[in-house]
């Protein structure tokens, strides 16, 4: 050890002396003595590492209290931090998918703060069923005989298969053997459910005769899977749900469908691309239909199954149902969201997902231009700020080839160095409320479609 290093080490303060500093007294009151002492020990270790490696004191040496405060605040932040989603993907899986309506937020808060009638029948003063209230709503909206709720749509598919076709064959078109995020594959789910996959048709063409020829004494289900996260175009042929349901009736084989994203309203009335609706499949005679709660429906993560009463009863009595059941917060949020669908005239205003999807390009562009003028003074020395047209996507595997015209604020470094974009994006990710955009074509793009809280955005961007 050199004499210079030894001198620097000697300048490091003792923990006891720091603890008696007035600034540290307030930190001890807020975070507790033990946590502050543990932090100071780590800070001293960090300081020794800096001295050993650089022969200098750390840059925060002059204000230990401020550095400790920053570290304690960072450690106290929730792992689930609010962010500003300007990626251009409305239902961003990594950012939590659908934002909840105010009614859903209030319902969840109430369910957390007080005992609720989760499985209690007020009329009979005995045990009730946790799905009952939602089943009534879902039947009213979809026209189904009954309904079942689990914790996500993957669970819904697993439960449908395990409860109705374990040990039997399930007939599916080869072009519908989907894989979604996290390597969730229909063939794997079938195997886990104890079913045998029977593929029919080809990747791009499947005919009604393929299903008929596949049926044998061990056939348990005919299954239709909506390819919500990819599209096959060109020389194609599929069997529609109504036709498949007719085949099922002829051969006395139940037909089930996995809709994936599942919209409860006709999106085309809002100028959006059409998606198949559960009520259409129920009307066509499909026995069971599953779909997600947190995609186009705009509610919490949940798996929803609607259909024939007798088959729903099979699901409810299966051991997996208890393992996969939804909790009271999910049920509270989902019920509040479904009630919004009873007043369709106000849905686009009250349901955040639909509100964001239906924003006009003109209103988004006006917002971007207005905010660009205010941000130019802050970033103009290093970056050229422009408002450019762009295309948003719905996300979460919904309508994969369809895009929504939007507008973005773009940041292009004057010196053309891509590293400046990476540094800027990293800086925004470290903000108290991170701002998340995307880097593309030599620019950092902030798609403004999902920006509703302008004041919070500007507060972060001007830090």
UniProtKB/Swiss-Prot annotation:
- Per UniProt, the enzyme's principal EC class comes to transferase
Classification via InterPro entries: PyrdxlP-dep_Trfase, PyrdxlP-dep_Trfase_major, SelA-like, SelA_trans, SelA_trans_N_dom
**What SUPFAM superfamilies does UniProt report for this protein, alphabetically?**
PLP-dependent transferases
Q: Where does it live in the cell? A: Cytoplasm
Keywords, in A-Z order = Cytoplasm, Protein biosynthesis, Pyridoxal phosphate, Selenium, Transferase
> What superkingdom does the record give?
Bacteria
| In-chain residues carrying the UniProt-annotated modification N6-(pyridoxal phosphate)lysine | 295
Q: Name one GO biological process term.
A: selenocysteine incorporation
Listed pathway(s): Aminoacyl-tRNA biosynthesis; selenocysteinyl-tRNA(Sec) biosynthesis; selenocysteinyl-tRNA(Sec) from L-seryl-tRNA(Sec) (bacterial route): step 1/1
EC numbers: 2.9.1.1
Cofactor(s) it depends on: pyridoxal 5'-phosphate
MF terms (GO), sorted A to Z: L-seryl-tRNA(Sec) selenium transferase activity
One GO cellular-component annotation of the UniProt record comes to: cytoplasm
User: Which catalysed reactions does the entry list for this protein?
Assistant: L-seryl-tRNA(Sec) + selenophosphate + H(+) = L-selenocysteinyl-tRNA(Sec) + phosphate
Functional summary from the UniProt entry:
Converts seryl-tRNA(Sec) to selenocysteinyl-tRNA(Sec) required for selenoprotein biosynthesis.
What is stated as this protein's family in its record? Belongs to the SelA family.
Q: How does it assemble?
A: Homodecamer; pentamer of dimers. Binds only one seryl-tRNA(Sec) per dimer.
Query: What protein does this entry describe?
Result: L-seryl-tRNA(Sec) selenium transferase
What organism is this sequence from?
A: Salmonella enteritidis PT4 (strain P125109)
